[in-house]
Swiss-Prot record:
Organism (species): Arabidopsis thaliana (Mouse-ear cress)
The family this protein is said to belong to: Belongs to the thiolase-like superfamily. HMG-CoA synthase family.
Gene3D superfamilies: 3.40.47.10
Signal peptide from the UniProt entry: none
Knockout consequences: Defect in pollen adhesion to the stigma resulting in male sterility under normal growth conditions.
Lineage: Eukaryota, Viridiplantae, Streptophyta, Embryophyta, Tracheophyta
Pathway(s) served: Metabolic intermediate biosynthesis; (R)-mevalonate biosynthesis; (R)-mevalonate from acetyl-CoA: step 2/3
Key words of the record: Lipid biosynthesis, Lipid metabolism, Steroid biosynthesis, Steroid metabolism, Sterol biosynthesis, Sterol metabolism, Transferase
Name of protein: Hydroxymethylglutaryl-CoA synthase
Alphabetized InterPro entries for the sequence: HMG_CoA_synt_AS (IPR000590), HMG_CoA_synt_C_dom (IPR013746), HMG_CoA_synth_N (IPR013528), HMG_CoA_synthase_euk (IPR010122), Thiolase-like (IPR016039)
Length: 461
């Protein structure tokens, strides 16, 4: 049986094109701070016509393979999590198989998992479970979380974003799953869904979605605490997690969610709540569950109490989600990548609790233990390979007008056929070695190219 199964290596790709939220506020005629303070977002990455979830996946996977010297023949399972529908039948995984076919490896299990922002977690758990099972053949698992989050013009548009993350799964990992510490909450709700197959845009009930997120958080945390207490014979509170990483549609929800965990600890009379905090929480002790979700006063008090804990346990996870935006399935893992980027020298022996949410709704809370392994599969090497700071600095800022123009073109192109992408002015923004969409033919078949290391445009997949 494989031991210490978890994440061996990670890499992230996000588009080099972005728009500043402050500029978007002014362009949209929104009140100053609506996006930057109200949502807690700084910047938003987006795909131009040259990029999509498939090209981003190619970039994340090939970069991970090159930097860790992984032979595609070493992969036995490939799982993709995404809610960005390119095709209602053909999976994103099958496009990626081109990287494996040329090496003669077609014996690769797994397909795509889809449920809003949760598919990446389903894909990850599938790979981890496979390595831990009797079915494991000794090869690595590979997980891709890839999404382009776009919204119609209006209040939801600033909560967009785009990215792909690749994770290599195997035994003796620096990031180990505490498999017994996992709790889920599944329910039927219409908080965010995409019933119009002719459009990329969702139908969203923002207020309901926030409540559903918090309900799922409460439920998962309660079950995780119960499981921990059965296994360890002692209580679990936020003090038992060194860091807590949240699915991040926008940063303000992350702040509210962490504060909610402290309120849960108060209701459970956990040791994380001191006397001063108890006094502040007491007026809200008799609220019904529904009342607690609607109480603005409780929300405010909770966040005040949570602030020092938040700064220590959550703030280091927020860089990429604030700078890139909502990456749907990749959001949780981009937040985790932010933690590795910020704290890679201090993570050995630490416990990280992860909370994944997908509308509809699906949610899982799970626990990771981080070890001080030797390179190439080490925490510090993951930070070095991802080069988050370098990638953020290399981006090109678009004016809001150009962003809106790009969104209109992408809206027009969604589900379209028989077109060749315009390279002029955009291809220069892509780094050498980057995969991009070349054309979609009259049969809707998608063809990708790869920018040469010398900047030339080469044929690809």
């Amino acid at each position: 049986m494989a031991k210490n199964v978890g994440i061996l290596a990670m890499d992230i790709y996000f588009p080099p094109t972005c728009v500043q939220q402050e500029a978007l506020e002014a362009h949209d005629g929104a009140s100053k701070g609506k996006y930057t303070i109200g949502l807690g977002q700084d910047c938003l990455a987006f795909c131009t016509e040259l990029e999509d979830v498939i090209s981003m996946s190619f970039n994340a996977v090939t970069s991970l393979f090159e930097k860790y010297k992984i032979d595609p023949n070493q992969i036995g399972r490939l799982e993709v999590g995404s809610e960005t529908v390119i095709d209602k039948s053909k999976s994103i995984k099958t496009f990626l198989m081109q990287l494996f076919e040329k090496c003669g490896n077609t014996d690769v299990e797994g397909v795509d998992s889809t449920n809003a922002c949760y598919g990446g977690t389903a894909a990850l758990l599938n790979c981890v479970n496979w390595v831990e099972s009797n079915s494991w053949d000794g090869r690595y698992g590979l997980v891709i979380c890839t999404d382009s989050a776009v919204y119609a013009e209006g209040p939801a548009r600033p909560t967009g974003g785009a990215a792909a993350i690749a994770m290599l799964i195997g035994p003796d990992a620096p990031i180990v799953f505490e498999s017994k510490l996992r709790a889920s909450h599944m329910a039927h709700v219409y908080d965010f869904y995409k019933p119009n197959l002719a459009s990329e845009y969702p139908v969203v009930d923002g207020k309901l979605s926030q409540t559903c997120y918090l309900m799922a958080l409460d439920s998962c945390y309660k079950h995780l605490c119960n499981k921990f207490e059965k296994i360890e014979g002692k209580e679990f509170s936020i003090n038992d997690a060194d860091y807590i990483v949240f699915h991040s549609p926008y940063n303000k929800l992350v702040q509210k969610s962490f504060a909610r965990l402290l309120y849960n600890d108060f209701l459970r009379n956990a040791s994380s709540i001191d006397e001063a905090a108890k006094e502040k929480f007491t007026p809200y002790s008799s609220l019904t569950l529904d009342e607690s979700y609607q109480s603005r006063d409780l929300e405010k008090v909770s966040q005040q109490i949570a602030k020092p804990f938040y700064d220590a346990k959550v703030q280091p996870t927020t860089l990429i989600p604030k700078e890139v935006g909502n990456m749907y399935t990749a959001s949780l893992y981009a937040a985790f990548a932010s933690l590795i980027h910020k704290k890679h020298n201090d993570l050995a022996g630490k416990r990280v609790v992860m909370f994944s949410y997908g509308s509809g709704s699906t949610a899982t809370m799970f626990s990771l233990r981080l070890n001080d392994n030797k390179p190439p599969f080490s925490i510090s090497n993951i930070a070095s390979v991802m080069d988050v700071g370098g990638k953020l600095k290399a981006r090109h800022e678009y004016a809001p007008e150009k962003f809106v123009e790009t969104m209109k073109l992408m809206e027009h192109r969604y589900g379209a056929k028989d077109f060749v992408t315009t390279k002029e002015g955009i291809i220069d923004l892509l780094a050498p070695g980057t995969y991009y969409l070349k054309e979609v033919d009259s049969l809707y078949r998608r063809f990708y190219g790869k920018k040469g290391e010398d900047g030339s445009v080469a044929n690809g997949h």
